[in-house]
Amino acid sequence: MAIEPFGDLLRTPGSAGLGAVVRAEKSPYIDGGTRYDMLPLYLYEGERLFLHGGRAGIKLLKQDDDRVDLFVEQRFEGFSADKIGPALAGMAPRTTGLDLGISWSSKRDWGTVQAELLRDISTASHGTEARVAYGYPLRSGRLALQPNITLSARDASLNDYYFGVRPGEATATRPAYAPGSGLNATVGLYGSYDLSERWRLLAGVSRTRFDRGIRNSPIVRDGAQTSVYLGAAYDFGAYKNAWASNRSPTYVKVLHGNASDSDCILVKIVTLRCTSTKDVGGTSINGIQIGKPFIEKLNGWPLDFVGYLALVRQNEKGFQPNGYRVDAFMKAYYTGLPWNARVQTRLGLGVGVSLAQRAPYDEVASQAARGRPTSRLLNYLDPSIDFSVGDVLGSAALKDTFLGVGCRIARGSSARRSCWAA
């Protein structure tokens, strides 16, 4: 796997961008077909913080052309229970993971060198990977290209999880197998084309040759793995660093939510067409979210971006032990509604990831009915609407106090929905 194929799109410090890339990747598994992933590109290049698509982190050191980062990144590997061929029948799915990593990069006239160390923190594989990469940026007019080569040293835990066969999964034609540690090599070519001052077309292709231990696995097909990328991104330009400003507000949100049926969406809640939650087995959550603004009044529009960290307690109503989860997400707020001069109202949409102490009960029950495994790592959407309590009551002291409702629509191995008030 290449290191951040589109991680250098923002050229101006303090800038932000938004886009998406479709990745088509030939599965390494026998009868695995082609996997398609829609990869959202949330881009932000702050003084200390950054977002590079599926990677978010902190700049520990930034000196001229040398940089050290601490980051988290989602690992897109494995196969799900509903997308397996005959060669994988009867095997437990191999799920995507979440890695914690540290990286070093150095830009020189002769190219860019990067090294990083990653460790799974989602307990999917418990694996570790070390990568080193070299790229040479080329530019001609609106076209920017970067050929790249990456070497990835993977430990036995990582390879055994994604490419091994456990003893309980062995059959007459699929013996138990553990590939052990190994070294993969990836070559790639990635590029962007400036359609305008702000819009960029993105494309890339890479090819990975697996270590011999992986290639000899009874579930891995012959040949290298090819990936193709195609997408677009919009560069909003540079903005004052709202996060670091002395006047930057801190958002504190206290919430309570109950699990709801799949058709109880935000629109129905607001219009009072869904005023109750699950009658049977409905679990609940209580939590606190802390947020800081990343961008205020984007492009002069009534649109703010706020980054949040949250600690949430899962109340499982006796079905299983209660637990905690940590959420990290970016949320956009639209404040341009026609009545906002009288009562400030915000429409919000958040996108993020959640790592739970144990898989939530709703996830466990839903997946058990389908005969599928659960996941502690969930991606989710967070739509909401809230209003200023001070504007409603005519109190200037409560002007910045908001009350609202929302839904947390999570998807790990399945979809689950919790609706909350805050």
Question: How would you name each of these model-derived features?
Answer:
Residues 3-14, 48-65, 110, 139-145, ...:
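Short loop/turn motifs that connect adjacent beta-strands in outer-membrane beta-barrel proteins
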Residues 121-214, 219-222, 294-296, 303, ...:
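Outer-membrane beta-barrel transmembrane domain signature
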Residues 22-28, 46-48, 72-78, 108-110, ...:
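Transmembrane beta-strands of outer-membrane beta-barrel pores
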